[in-house]
């Protein structure tokens, strides 16, 4: 990766260039082969080098696209993942307790059984994400986009859902403190509520 960055000027290459494709292939290969501790080192490097940032204004692809990466079971508790592009990344059973994911893009990500207690996902994109049975207690989802997200069996006690877009989301079997949590959501259109009532 260092050679691609320094000698091949990876940052200046087009998204469909050979250099970008090689960087992505090498990264996905590393995530398949390495243990979780080393996967965390790779992710930290990519983050610090600003190779996986998501630009909410331009919607440009990051320099290294992580879609399809396997980060299952990783310990990312307390990590600063603000604004990262984690679209379609497998994050099943990941520990994201108290992590910062403000404005991160997690569209189509798989977060089944993930620990997100106390995490800040304000403004995050979670459209079509699978958060089934995730622990979202005391999580901030203020202004988060959760269109068609799966929250089946998720623990949403003390979760901040203010101005969150929950249109067409599935909250079947989810646990809430009270119904007032949902009153401040931006949209509940066609949302499947915890008692399986569809809000239209």
Predicted regions: what is each one?
Residues 56-200:
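Tandem repeat scaffolds
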Residues 1-67, 72, 180-200:
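N-terminal capping/linker segments that flank leucine-rich repeat
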């Amino acid at each position: 990766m260092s050679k691609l960055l320094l000698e091949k000027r990876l940052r200046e290459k087009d998204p469909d260039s050979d250099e970008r494709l090689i960087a992505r292939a090498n990264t996905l290969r590393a995530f398949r082969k390495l243990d979780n501790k080393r996967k965390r080192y790779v992710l930290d490097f990519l983050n610090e080098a600003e190779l996986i940032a998501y630009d909410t204004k331009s919607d440009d692809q990051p320099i290294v696209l992580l879609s399809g990466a396997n980060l299952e079971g990783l310990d990312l508790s307390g990590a600063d993942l603000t604004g990262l592009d984690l679209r379609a990344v497998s994050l099943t059973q990941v520990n994201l307790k108290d992590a910062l994911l403000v404005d991160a893009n997690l569209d189509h990500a798989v977060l089944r059984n993930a620990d997100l207690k106390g995490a800040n996902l304000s403004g995050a994109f979670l459209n079509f994400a699978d958060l089934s049975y995730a622990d979202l207690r005391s999580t901030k989802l203020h202004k988060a986009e959760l269109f068609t997200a799966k929250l089946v069996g998720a623990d949403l006690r003390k979760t901040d859902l203010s101005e969150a877009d929950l249109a067409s989301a599935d909250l079947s079997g989810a646990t809430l403190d009270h119904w007032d949590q949902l009153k401040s959501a931006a949209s509940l259109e066609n949302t499947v509520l915890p008692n399986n009532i569809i809000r239209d």
